[in-house]
Amino acid sequence: MKLKDGLILREVAGQFVVVPMGKRVQEVTSIVYISSSGAYLWDYMKDHEFQKEDLVKKILEHYTGVTGEQAAVDIEKFLKTLADNNILDDGKIRGQVFVKMPKGTGKDGV
């Protein structure tokens, strides 16, 4: 998975805010704040495709006193927040997709 393009992270009044640009303004309709650890991950995520395990590893390398189990739970919540706010491109097609098939190629031969 990866972050969608057209999104930047800005620090405003001590808080990290995801700012949509261009066409993303219509998709990301809420103000999304992320923690400093989320901002640390964002810096990696903006330039890489990643899996949950990659982010857990980054957290464990950067922070002391965090267990792998707790990091995995926190990363899952973080990724859900990003996905719920149309920030994460996880490769899944959402919504309806209609494909017009040429005659004779349908499952019933029509």
What are these regions (language model features)?
Residues 5, 18-19, 67:
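Intrinsically disordered, low-complexity segments enriched in polar/charged residues with Gly/Pro
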Residues 10-40:
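Short alpha-helical segments that sit at the start of domains
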Residues 30-110:
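Long, charge-rich, low-complexity alpha-helical segments
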